Amino acid sequence: EDCVTVRTIRRLADSVFIETAEGRTEAVHEWGGVWRAVLPGTDIPDYRVVAVYGDVENLSDDPYRFLPTVGDMDTYLFSEGRHERLWEALGAHVRTYPSELGEISGVSFAVWAPNAKAVRVIGDFNGWDGTLTAMRTMGSSGIWEIFVPGALEGQRYKFEIQYPDLSWHQKADPMARRAEVPPSTASIVTRSRFTWEDEEWMDERAGKDPHAGPISVYEMHLGSWRPGLSYREIAEQLIGHVQYCGFTHVE
């Protein structure tokens, strides 16, 4: 008989149900907090996991019913070393998906950890416990990925990486758009709202040969260039200084 098997981990639950638009199906406890439910049909339906703890029901969306947010072209270009828009594939991105059970919002996470045995994402959205948010490996690319329903912009997060010696280590996101102020080290989910207004400059650049033009790079450290300034204050002073000195680029 055609059916769909759903497995989920709810270690302390007294009972677990899988809820679809058609109703609830009770799951069977297999072992070690792993529960299994069998749904009729061949297509994976929109569903949620209902975990019962005493008199309390906890309703949540399953991260693993969503397709990977990193596509085949991303992994191919990344493996070739030719991916030129990595900030769109890796890091943390707020997303919303339609569903028969209602619109689902959350955050997709992706990180490159080619030598990891396993990777989990931890943060404010899961009590810093990655048990239910172990990330999926994207084949030989070394990329790990997961979509976490219910995660919100502004929440802190880190990646928890298992080394070959089986030890776990917490790491900040190298592709994060925002981070905590030191000495705290967590990354922060942040949506990009910047509107570029450099069409004229981009059009002018398109007509030039970058290999034939001059280049003079001004290398600087933001924190020590002129201490006490914000990013915007630095920008106001830096551009005029660089132009006056005759540099063409800033690092």
Predicted feature locations:
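Short proline/glycine-enriched turn/loop motifs at strand-loop junctions of beta-rich domains
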Residues: I9-S15, W112-V119
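Short beta-strand and strand-turn-strand segments in soluble, beta-rich domains
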Residues: G127-G130
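Ordered, small/hydrophobic-rich secondary-structure cores
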Residues: E1-L12, F17, G32
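Catalytic domains of carbohydrate-active enzymes, especially glycoside hydrolases
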Residues: Q237-E251
